[in-house]
Design a protein with these regions (language model features):
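Cysteine-rich micro-motifs
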Residues: 100-111
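Short amphipathic alpha-helical interaction segments
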Residues: 49-62
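Short acidic, hydrophobic short linear motifs in intrinsically disordered regions
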Residues: 23-46
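Short, cationic-aromatic polyanion-contact patches
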Residues: 74-89, 116-120
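A short, conserved structural fragment
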Residues: 61-74
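Cys/His-rich microdomains that often coordinate metals
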Residues: 94, 111-112
């Protein structure tokens, strides 16, 4: 499993968590996440679910270590809300938890804006 695949899955999983939390869901079954990703994201539509599940292990460990998620057995719970922010330098869309530093996950730039921008 490549570093690129892990970073990409990290972004898609954060996107999934953001969207689900906005719909009121904050607890997830660890085993169902690969299937959910394959169903909801065209990127993983034809993915091998066992491979996707293996790639998800370091991603989930990273999110737990960064206090985005907490693990209770086979259940993953969000520790707070995720903010969707766009980097002013590279335009990357970041999904950051309150506990994480407000820096771009791609270029480490600190100038992040709400995405989409709020209308005045």
């Amino acid at each position: 499993m490549s570093d690129v695949a892990i970073r990409e899955l990290n972004w898609y999983l954060r996107d999934h968590l953001f969207r689900q939390s906005n719909a009121g869901k904050t607890a997830f079954q660890r085993e169902s996440l690969p299937g959910d990703m394959a169903t909801l994201y065209l990127r993983y539509k034809n993915a091998d679910l066992s491979q996707l599940s293996q790639t998800m292990v370091p991603v989930i460990e990273d999110l737990v270590s960064k206090k985005v998620l907490e693990q209770d057995g086979k259940v993953l719970r969000m520790r707070g809300r995720l903010a969707r922010l766009q980097c002013a330098k590279c335009f990357y869309i970041n999904y950051l938890a309150e506990a994480e530093p407000r820096v771009c996950l791609r270029c480490q730039h600190a100038d992040l804006h709400d995405f989409p921008k709020k209308k005045a």
